[in-house]
Structure formats: structure tokens, C-alpha cells
């Protein structure tokens, strides 16, 4: 019964409030997006996706979203340039 009373003090956590604090390494972004490290390196340079870090690239949640939008567009048949443009336009419209 003590456990039930303690649980009454807890409130749901709104993760949206904390997304800007998330930092992901290259391998994590690749795993989440389903792409290779070579693809991510190339896309990061080609699309000028901002990263932090000097020795290792660190991506924020916005960069991850951009990568996933590019992947989605490529999966639908767009070439890389068109996929990058589509991802940019999509993000601008939101």
C-alpha cells in the first residue's frame, strides 16, 4: 500500500520539453535513421546539417529529423538533391 501512495505523487513526464537537450552521436543517428555512416557523413556535408563536437559529430533532435526526412524522400524515389530540398521545404512549412 505504501507504494500506491508514493505513486500518487508522480506526474506524467512531457518529453517534448526535453527534446532540445538530446544529443546523438553519428552511430546513434545512423541506427535510428537506418542509414550507413558513410551516407550520414555525405548527407551532413551535402545538406549542411549542423553538428556540434570537434572529434566526433554530435547531432541534435532537429538534425535527426532532417536526416530522417531526407531518408524518407530518398525511399520514395527522390535523388539526394531533391530529397534535401524536400526536407528543407517541409521543415520551413511547419
Which residues does each PLM region occupy?
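Arg/Lys-rich, alpha-helical DNA-contact motif
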Residues: 1-31, 45-50, 61-94
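Key DNA-contact positions within bacterial/archaeal DNA-binding proteins
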Residues: 38
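Short, Lys/Arg-rich nucleic-acid/phosphate-binding segment
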Residues: 53-58
